[in-house]
């Protein structure tokens, strides 16, 4: 069994954190060999990588299994698809995004249907994919891990300090709701326009998220689009299918969360009692303002349990075991 590492760089935002964490978790398995072929860069680098990928795939046999990150850039996908059909080895993509579900068009679902097994985000994404492939070929990761090497520092919790943290890509194109008058969030991330906002605390290295571990009764927010009344637009609608990585970021730091009540991850949050599913920002603020410290501490204890699993890679590890066991019978 092989894991294709397609990375050769890091960034301050969390865009590639999930791929790096998957690599680190897969590297712990004695029966999984990591193959390092960067699939990013300029024209020359892509030509070199195409040759390396083709050479590697030529050596695979029908008993071999290749796990890789999805989506994969088109030229490399075409190479992989060609050798997959030719040599009959098995391929298992770990889905990070499906462009057609966030208004990007394309035919990701058709490509995924050609795979031998697929690692999906959650039941809602699986339901969508099952229109194109057999559901028994789809495994859910439930939530992305967020590996953190150190323990979470103790956070002083008092009812004198309470607030909501929003982290990620702060571009107006993606989350213009944060620029709405009256939205009083503590902000972390890139592409923020109002740098003089005292509640904008800059960006941080995705590998070291301790900066968001602020004192008080703090929550993380999962919300996208241009409205405070609902999640709207392509990015807002995408929450109905995907697992936003910022959810794992917040939980890794033991922060309970607020999430849109129509988001695919809402059931996970509510079922594990690690936050609230809300229909509007106003509803969220009412909960924050009225919450007792006893209630917050109870939710925080639940969050610590999930946080430990996320920080140590339990969710990808569990779904990897499912994939390995299932492929043994095929």
Curated annotation (Swiss-Prot):
It is an enzyme of class 2 (transferase). Pathway: Bacterial outer membrane biogenesis; lipopolysaccharide biosynthesis. The keyword Transferase applies. It is found in: Cytoplasm. One of its GO terms (cellular component) is cytoplasm. Gene3D superfamilies: Glycogen Phosphorylase B (3.40.50.2000). It comes from the Bacteria. Keywords: Cytoplasm, Lipopolysaccharide biosynthesis, Transferase. This is Beta-1,6-galactofuranosyltransferase WbbI. It comes from Escherichia coli (strain K12).
